[in-house]
């Protein structure tokens, strides 16, 4: 049996205050899609609007009015996993935080345990950023000293 996503009316959508509705062209575009979609749209309707930027489509639907909270959380986990695929050796705390989120979604851990995993992942991100910045600063200083004639 196919599930049905909630639909949002044009009036409800305007309460989200889309920034592109601030100019005449953006407002015309919204009114065009209101007519095209019959005054209501669900997340899939909006995600399939190819002439709307990816950023605007995601901004529009990544909210509980369009998508159930559990799916939004799972989507966040998948985005985080995709980002970690770009890192040669991701910090285990980041990987564990994603798993903790899924455990929380299944009711296997408490909100406090999830918060602890999130804090550990945040520490990992800061550690990585600090290390990268420090390496960059060392290289910058070496290059500056070389530019100034110091071998």
Language-model features, listed with the residues they occupy:
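Short, glycine-biased loop/turn motifs at secondary-structure junctions and
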Residues: 1-151
């Amino acid at each position: 049996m196919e599930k049905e996503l909630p639909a949002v009316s044009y009036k409800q959508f305007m309460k989200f205050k889309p920034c592109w509705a601030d100019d005449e062209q953006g407002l015309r575009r919204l009114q065009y899609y209101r007519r095209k979609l019959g005054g209501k749209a669900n997340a899939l309707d909006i995600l399939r609007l190819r002439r709307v930027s990816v950023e605007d489509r995601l901004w529009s639907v990544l909210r509980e009015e369009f998508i159930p909270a559990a799916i939004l959380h799972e989507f966040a986990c998948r985005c985080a996993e995709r980002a970690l695929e770009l890192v040669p050796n991701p910090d285990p705390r980041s990987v564990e935080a994603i798993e903790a989120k899924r455990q929380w979604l299944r009711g296997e851990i408490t909100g406090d345990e999830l918060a602890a995993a999130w804090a550990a992942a945040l520490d990992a991100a800061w550690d990585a950023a600090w290390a990268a910045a420090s390496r960059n600063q060392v290289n910058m200083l070496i290059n500056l000293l070389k530019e100034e004639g110091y071998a």
